[in-house]
Amino acid sequence: MQAVRGLSFDVDAGKTLGIVGESGSGKSVSTQTIMGLVRGARVSGTALFEGRDLLTMGSHDLQQVRGAKVGMIFQDPLSSLHPYYKVGWQIEEMIRQHDKSASKAQARHRAIDLLQLVGIPQPDRRVDDYPHQFSGGMRQRAMIAMAMALNPQLLIADEPTTALDVTVQAQVLQVMKTLQEEFGTAIIMITHDLGVIADIADEVIVMYAGAVMERADRRTIFYENHHPYTEGLLESLPAYGDDRERLLPIAGQPPSLINLPSGCPFHPRCPYVFDRCRTETPDLGPVGGDVTHLSACWLPHDMAARNARRKEVIGHARPMPAEAMAAAETAGGEA
């Protein structure tokens, strides 16, 4: 089974790359494989970090990168934090594992500073609490503190806000943005939540069935997207000022990676599908000659022609980009 195919990206310092898609699209397994966390994975290609290929590194060298230069935040902090050890001790252990010159006292002081940095109240006291004594939002903040303990150049955040309510989610995202501004950290944000993408991402990759469907900057993805899957994800979301009586879910289910359909993997669910989609797999290429906006779709890149196809197939045209932007800004919802 090929879980991910043809994935390529780069992340600059101080920028955030968002990777979005449904469950099983290959979002998480791609970064976990790059960091050597998927046993038995067969990988081709390169993953360059500071000029070195992470995919060919030995386990010892990779261990020196993980935590120190690349921090990771996982979806469930309760399962990521050891229940038998105090939160502060776990952060201190991370520091001392990678900084052999740090004493216990120095590591503890750094742990307290980190907890304060991510907004944990009374950090000098909470440093001695166990994970079960923290709320869900506080545990996630503690995971961010641990991931940022050594000021990594890159932070991989794998669904870090999924289990949090909207208020706590906003607080956690603000903590990450503040840390990014302070330290110039590059972030890879993996999520199925387009609201999170709208809040934090500079560039966005949309994945489906292990492949990239579309890649562009945030504004283009939200207002001038080209791929029907991206369009479907956005149309299935409720929005402020939306007067629709019903949401528009994407029909069907994602395919099994063991038995992918021929042609475009999205064609069984696509409202625009035509014969070529069923037999030929489109390459990821520029939309209308724009090399910063890539899409893997056989639809015309000209928006007017594409809307004509939409009207022919499903009876109404999609608003043009200027109209969509004006409507969003009138509702106060500019991404």
Residue ranges and their predicted role:
Residues M1, L54-G71, Q97, K104, ...:
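ABC ATPase NBD coupling module
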Residues P121-R125, R215-E329:
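Short catalytic/signature loops enriched in Gly
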Residues V43-D53:
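Conserved ABC transporter NBD signature motif
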Residues R52-D53, A105-R125, L234:
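Conserved ABC ATPase "signature" region
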Residues G36, L154-P160, L164-R246:
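P-loop NTP-binding/switch modules centered on Walker-like glycine-rich loops
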Residues A149-Q153:
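A short, proline-enriched helix->beta-strand linker immediately N-terminal to the Walker B motif
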